[in-house]
């Protein structure tokens, strides 16, 4: 064995704390960023929040022309020590992105959220407490409510409920009587044993003089399977109902709720604050950051001036350290805003047809297209478009919504999957309800428009729109 010295040159990327902070801020959603900045304000005395009225607007050029890419790139850049295109896997695990939401709203930007977090069981127990039950019946009612799932159906038999009462002796008739009272709670039909039971309970709440009530009850009691399969021809034959009567009875049944429990929202509220505002001004689409969504930070000059006059080294070091942290945070925030604005402007420039005419005119676009246009890495584009929302006259969308794969067209062009999905939705909306379009027919109609896709692809797009197959869409006209 021989020993020796060898000289080797190598380069490595050093992930400094400042770089980690810059990339992490880039990934955070607006709400997460607000929490991050609020914590920084509480922990760092060298940071303070500025008055929005005194803050200089740095979101867009004075000529209000956001689609000028050259102007968009003329922003204050970060020092070379903050290469935001560094590998995200080394630092942070991305959260789950959200989808597009909502319809058009006015210039005011409210926070969007779910209506309630009350569970179905809580809502039913509230009604139990308001009902004059005996102690025994209240115990039975509690057991019944505990056995109701999120869709509103009873998950156990009445015998199991009776046995769950323990030392309390109750008859099956008592359990049945309490169950019938609960089934008339709001929402009506809750705690039903099955779909047939649920629909019949809801029908029982109608006035006896309601037109087509008996016909609807007949269909539910004896021919629910035919109705589920949309086999109207057989249904007319076995019920001996005329087509007009059958249509009215089916309409009455369709007005009922097959999952009454889902009308009570149980999920946590979802908050959406738009990061970017898109408006049309003087015939051009303008893009700006939502100035109300992010706190404006600045250095506290009073404390900063104490840096050189501190009484001891410990105080001086404390002030210097916090001052440096504050400067890096402000610069990282500026970099985040600049990157978000540049990417958003580029997206709007590429997708102007969508904002003008809708989903059918969405252009195929991938991360690499925007990355090349703004001269950034694809990983940076992915971070800055995740959990960032754009508010436009067409609604609120996550920035990632504007990226979609492409499908070749007959003329040698390309169509985005989003546009094709919109066309499928449009074709189905215009179909004859008595003869709905099959996936094969939809494929043929798309082919006539020069869009060559497989039938299974059309089926996938239809399912992503939560549209049932043609045999389930068939209706009486």
UniProtKB/Swiss-Prot annotation:
A motif (RPON box) lies at residues 454-462. One of its GO terms (molecular function) is DNA-binding transcription activator activity. InterPro entries: RNA_pol_sigma_54, RNA_pol_sigma_54_core-bd, RNA_pol_sigma_54_DNA-bd, RpoN_core-bd_sf. The keyword Repeat does not apply. Gene3D superfamilies: Homeodomain-like (1.10.10.60), RNA polymerase sigma-54 factor, core-binding domain (1.10.10.1330). Belongs to the sigma-54 factor family. Residues 366-385 bind DNA. The gene is rpoN. GO terms for cellular component: DNA-directed RNA polymerase complex; protein-DNA complex. This is RNA polymerase sigma-54 factor. Sigma factors are initiation factors that promote the attachment of RNA polymerase to specific initiation sites and are then released. This sigma factor is responsible for the expression of enzymes involved in arginine catabolism. The open complex (sigma-54 and core RNA polymerase) serves as the receptor for the receipt of the melting signal from the remotely bound activator protein GlnG(NtrC). GO terms for biological process: arginine metabolic process; DNA-templated transcription initiation; regulation of DNA-templated transcription. Keywords: Arginine metabolism, DNA-binding, DNA-directed RNA polymerase, Nucleotidyltransferase, Sigma factor, Transcription, Transcription regulation, Transferase. The keyword Flavoprotein does not apply.
